[in-house]
């Protein structure tokens, strides 16, 4: 059940003028600490959209992101989908309240990239997290 005091989004959602995401279920939406956050019980996606201010190629940005990846990362995936290069990896984080699973995903487009960290309590939500990352779509390129 989503929180009644926050906006609810589902399906295709235009995050910025350049990037959209498709959410497979109803999620609440908020802005927190400069991030766009989508959440529902058991799964939370923290999202930041970056511009390509330095005019770097997708490959240059991918290499930079790869060098900044945690040494604890596993299950890394790379692929190109149309004009978007995708990179993701998993982390398992141990916190005071227990184990939290995470999928960190990047969609690298012509004019920028999206960074998304999706945290989920139940390993069964991994496919939902992957579907959200795969749905990131650059909608307006110059």
Model-derived features with residue positions:
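Short, flexible beta-strand-to-coil junctions
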Residues: 41-43, 50-54, 92-96, 109-111, ...
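Signature of long, low-cysteine stretches enriched in small and polar/charged residues
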Residues: 64-112, 119
């Amino acid at each position: 059940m989503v929180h009644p005091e926050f906006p609810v989004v589902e399906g295709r959602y235009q995050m910025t003028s350049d990037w959209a995401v498709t959410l497979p279920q109803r999620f609440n939406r908020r802005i927190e600490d400069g991030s766009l956050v989508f959440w529902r019980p058991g799964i939370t996606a923290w999202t930041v959209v970056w511009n390509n201010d330095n005019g770097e190629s997708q490959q240059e940005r991918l290499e930079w992101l790869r060098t900044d990846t945690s040494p604890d990362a596993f299950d890394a995936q790379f692929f190109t989908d149309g004009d978007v290069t995708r990179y993701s990896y998993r982390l398992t984080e141990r916190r005071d309240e227990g184990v939290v699973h995470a999928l960190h995903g990047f969609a690298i487009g012509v004019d920028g990239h999206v960074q998304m960290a999706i945290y989920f309590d139940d390993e069964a939500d991994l496919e939902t997290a992957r579907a959200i990352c795969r749905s990131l779509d650059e909608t307006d390129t110059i």
